[in-house]
């Protein structure tokens, strides 16, 4: 994609995580319970992807490894529709709570 000189170019990113994985619930919803909770991420991403397709918009989707492991078809669709895929770590752990080794392990786990 090329842009004319002096044109406005915007960046758009999406955090691909489920409702129970947002920071507001950290300390309220235990990570060990995630498997038993109602999953909405695929349905919500479908809606976002459709809106972006309708508007001919591309974005970067920052995806949790936890979500990627459970929804590989969703990640393939994101890429197939021309969006960029990026890592948001394994399970949304805040980097300032991790030491260097834990951070490296989290990124490596998410990469796989």
Show which residues each predicted segment covers.
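Catalytic alpha-helical scaffold of carbohydrate-active enzymes acting on polysaccharides/glycoconjugates
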Residues: 1-112
């Amino acid at each position: 994609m090329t842009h004319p000189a002096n044109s406005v170019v915007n960046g758009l990113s999406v955090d691909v995580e489920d409702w129970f994985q947002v920071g507001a619930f950290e300390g309220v919803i235990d990570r060990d319970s995630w498997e038993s909770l109602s999953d909405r991420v695929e349905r919500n991403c479908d809606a976002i992807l459709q809106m972006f397709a309708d508007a001919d918009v591309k974005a970067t989707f920052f995806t949790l490894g936890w979500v990627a492991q459970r929804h590989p078809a969703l990640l393939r669709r994101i890429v197939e529709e021309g969006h960029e895929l990026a890592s948001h770590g394994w399970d949304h752990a805040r980097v300032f709570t991790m030491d260097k080794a834990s951070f490296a392990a989290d990124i490596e786990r998410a990469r796989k």
